[in-house]
Amino acid sequence: MNRLPSSASALACSAHALNLIEKRTLNHEEMKALNREVIDYFKEHVNPGFLEYRKSVTAGGDYGAVEWQAGSLNTLVDTQGQEFIDCLGGFGIFNVGHRNPVVVSAVQNQLAKQPLHSQELLDPLRAMLAKTLAALTPGKLKYSFFCNSGTESVEAALKLAKAYQSPRGKFTFIATSGAFHGKSLGALSATAKSTFRRPFMPLLPGFRHVPFGNIDAMSMAFSEGKKTGDEIAAVILEPIQGEGGVILPPQGYLTEVRKLCDEFGALMILDEVQTGMGRTGKMFACEHENVQPDILCLAKALGGGVMPIGATIATEEVFSVLFDNPFLHTTTFGGNPLACAAALATINVLLEQNLPAQAEQKGDTLLDGFRQLAREYPNLVHDARGKGMLMAIEFVDNETGYRFASEMFRQRVLVAGTLNNAKTIRIEPPLTLTIELCEQVLKSARNALAAMQVSVEEV
């Protein structure tokens, strides 16, 4: 039976939500009611599949961890007042912590003046952020296109590469096995997981996938393309595969890919949506090898965990294809004043507090601890790996990985799996995580594995 629109119901629902937004705390009855509402509305109006996905953060089927507020720079608080150490970081958006006061203040100050731009007059913060990124990024990267997400930044990169290379008769892209570049149609064509790709086949033509980290396979793809006249327009890579399971390539791999691109006249697109903004111990992961891409994709942490923003930064030679018609690729909300204010403040915090260096030091501490645990529990843990504050613990199978996430939740530490590798649990905390909290995370991981070991022995 068709449901008629109800203005009265919509008004009541929005008013109820606004009342909740105004509240700082909830009493016990309000908390229980909110939990029930959120679960019901997710089931009936968002997507019931998300409830199954979040089964590791529920007890007794009540999905008690309904997110309510940030506890501190490094923690989250649910509606029951339980505080969790955040080792997920919103999949890498909270590099400067939760509600970083510098970022929040910048956004609030801009909100008091002009939240969104007119679209016709020149907006100053977009210009200032573009200038800042030109100074911050490696090599000849100079011009920025701003959008709202990592997927959008990849879409822009692919379109830029097409616009630049099509007149040169080059139409083919090389991506890698295990890659994740987003789920819009263009980005999905570069993404490598069949689960995400198959329902939307056929995707964009002209994408080849080669094994990640295998420079011989990459070289062969270039050579074969040259022989057949199907020449390569661009290579798109993550310096470290995030959703693939935090997979690090062999040292020198990016350097060799850069050489191949130069030899065959292809563009190098680096997707640093997850590895960028200090996450791996450098501002950008490509700096570990001093590699300079032609196009760089950023998002996630660029907005400081306060505003969504993505950026596609390119050299003048590549970006100039948009000079004659700047409306070839645009987006209404991309580069809006609030998002740019957040990004500028985020960059300021990263540099002022030298957070990339902190990520390297704290990451070493955590990774050493996880590797020790892997040695102690070889029947549960297959590997521990990472760079900076982008780490992963790979378990012997998917179910063991899920049990670890569930046990860590009981220890009040938030972790989750990677999208392309279910048995791998990512450890991706804010770069502001204190040494004391690092030690607490390792203690919790030890407790979780010990509990899992007892269960195994009882069986």
Curated annotation (Swiss-Prot):
GO terms for molecular function: diamine transaminase activity; identical protein binding; putrescine--2-oxoglutarate transaminase activity; pyridoxal phosphate binding. One of its GO terms (biological process) is putrescine catabolic process. It comes from the Bacteria. Its cofactor is pyridoxal 5'-phosphate. It comes from Salmonella typhimurium (strain LT2 / SGSC1412 / ATCC 700720). Pfam families: Aminotran_3. This is Putrescine aminotransferase. It is an enzyme of class 2 (transferase). CDD domains: OAT_like. It catalyses: an alkane-alpha,omega-diamine + 2-oxoglutarate = an omega-aminoaldehyde + L-glutamate; putrescine + 2-oxoglutarate = 1-pyrroline + L-glutamate + H2O; cadaverine + 2-oxoglutarate = 5-aminopentanal + L-glutamate. Pyridoxal 5'-phosphate binds at residues 150-151, 274, 332. Its EC number is 2.6.1.82, 2.6.1.29. Pathway: Amine and polyamine degradation; putrescine degradation; 4-aminobutanal from putrescine (transaminase route): step 1/1. HAMAP family: Putres_aminotrans_3.
